[in-house]
């Protein structure tokens, strides 16, 4: 049973990665289901076991790639000495931006789709990756004794701010380059954090 599940997961991941390569290289509109299965070396029937059509695949791929990004960021965070939730937020921001700068195809694909909606859907559907990231965030609120009235709204604001501002700064250096903009982004994130965090709980 384990081998069967592993094989299914392998096939789905192969389809997702192949689709990502084609969507970012050839373009979504010009890519067909036949293109995807042929390059993946799988039968068309296998495709329809996992996805309704290429639009369904694209939506799942956005969540899949976003989850990978959150998972990698979480792993890096676990290896770093951090002393506050605010420091965690800035560390994760820099990690995500650095990945986008190195993998601009990922940035172009996710574009403004790295949103709260995608993240929330992934968590809600039981994605282990997103769940771990989200649970870590909620645990950090407790760990650092942070009193936040609406943690989900804080996370939503942070994700939306980072994703909406990084695209043009990285790809087009407009209105300025990402390196020039980053200090202002950090200050903005700190202010957002201050607005949502009511006070520290002293134990």
Q: Could you tell me what each predicted segment is?
A:
Residues 98-135, 171:
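Short secondary-structure transition hinges
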Residues 4, 10-14, 18:
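N-terminal positioning helix adjacent to the helix-turn-helix/winged-helix DNA-binding module
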Residues 60, 75-102, 155-158:
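Hydrophobic alpha-helical connector segments
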Residues 148-171, 180-192:
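Hydrophobic alpha-helical segments that form the core
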Residues 67, 71, 118-145, 152-156, ...:
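Amphipathic alpha-helical packing segments from all-alpha helical-bundle domains
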Residues 14, 22-56, 60:
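Helix-turn-helix
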Residues 201-203:
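Conserved small/polar residues in nucleotide/adenosyl-binding loops
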Residues 11, 54, 65-69, 92, ...:
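Hydrophobic/aromatic residues within well-ordered alpha-helical segments
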């Amino acid at each position: 049973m384990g081998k069967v599940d592993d094989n299914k997961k392998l096939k789905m991941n192969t389809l997702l990665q192949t689709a990502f390569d084609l969507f970012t290289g050839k373009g979504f509109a010009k890519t067909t289901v036949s293109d995807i299965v042929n390059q993946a070396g799988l039968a068309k029937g296998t495709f329809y076991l996992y996805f309704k059509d290429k639009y369904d695949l694209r939506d799942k791929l956005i969540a899949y790639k976003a989850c990978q990004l959150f998972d990698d960021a979480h792993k890096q965070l676990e290896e770093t000495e951090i002393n506050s939730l605010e420091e965690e937020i800035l560390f994760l921001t820099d990690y995500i931006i650095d990945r986008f700068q190195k993998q601009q195809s990922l940035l172009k694909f996710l574009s403004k789709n790295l949103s709260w909606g995608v993240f929330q859907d992934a968590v809600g559907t039981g994605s282990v990756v997103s769940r771990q990231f989200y649970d870590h965030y909620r645990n950090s609120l407790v760990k650092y004794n942070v009193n936040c009235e609406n943690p989900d709204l804080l996370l939503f604001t942070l994700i939306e701010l980072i994703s909406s501002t990084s695209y043009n700064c990285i790809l087009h250096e407009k209105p300025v380059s990402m390196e020039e903009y980053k200090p202002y982004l950090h200050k903005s994130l700190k202010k957002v954090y201050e607005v949502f965090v009511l006070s520290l709980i002293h134990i």
